[in-house]
Amino acid sequence: MSILTHRPRRLRKQEFNRSLVRENTLSASDLIYPIFIIEGENTREKIDSMPGIERLSIDQLLIEAKEIVDLKIQAVALFPVISSEKKTEEAEESYNSDGLVQRAVRALKRSFPDLAVITDVALDPFTSHGQDGLIDSNGYVLNDETVDILIKQALSHAEAGADIVAPSDMMDGRIGAIRNALEESGFIHTNILSYAAKYASSFYGPFRDAVGSSGNLGKSDKKTYQMDPGNANEAIREVELDINEGADMVMIKPGLPYLDIVSNVKQTFGVPTFAYHVSGEYAMLKAASQQNWIDEKSTVLETLLCFKRAGADAILTYFAKDAARWIKDS
């Protein structure tokens, strides 16, 4: 038998070997927890398509935030559920200074000043038609007119105390417009997390159920502004545009089916790159684990580690609390 000079298995034999040479690790500080918020008091509503996730009134949000802080998770992302009577074609409620998001931000920053609060800048929770922008008589989403509303929305979030505003709408030029407005208004330290590469994906269904936009959207889609799932080079162009317009971080959405995009963006630009482990991905893992087809803990932690390996600096995931507990207990 010939002598083997290289035996890669030597570094896999024992746990200390594997731990010492592990290239990527996962910690609670890598995770961002998305939270759905609703009007009312002492209210928690289950979401059928997202087992374990609830819509929370602001008082319950503060209870949740205490747990999040104790788990060493450093950031939350807020997504509002707006009542139908407040939804309009012009999405005026999106920039109401006393709106649900704005009040939630103020409450969080008063009670947990060191917890980073990320707000979603998009109009779909606020429009009667469920699109992310204003529409013309043919239902086509109007770009520049929508950007004008997004600026107002982002400013209202910054005024409330949001640490990071996150435009997820995919309108052209909105990052530069929002950055200019923030600078001119004195919000020079407000971060912009751009959903720079957001695909027209089938994985968003449970999210739309959660925020109540699926019924408004009906049989329409968002393919005229969200990206085609078949495109990779386009993602690089979109990210480059947003970086040049003033984005501090960029988001790839969805996550797991688009790890190639996460990797390409990180390798190409070297900027803070986040990934969104979206509602459909969460629902699939939850459903499989509830049927005992997979082990939830090991599968989720492996999935999140894969995001890190691909180059993600942070992961927005509905498993954040569970993962943080598992990491803490390991």
Residue ranges and their predicted role:
Residues 1-22:
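N-terminal amphipathic/basic leader segments beginning at the initiator methionine
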Residues 2-6, 26-32, 38-330:
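Alpha/beta enzyme core
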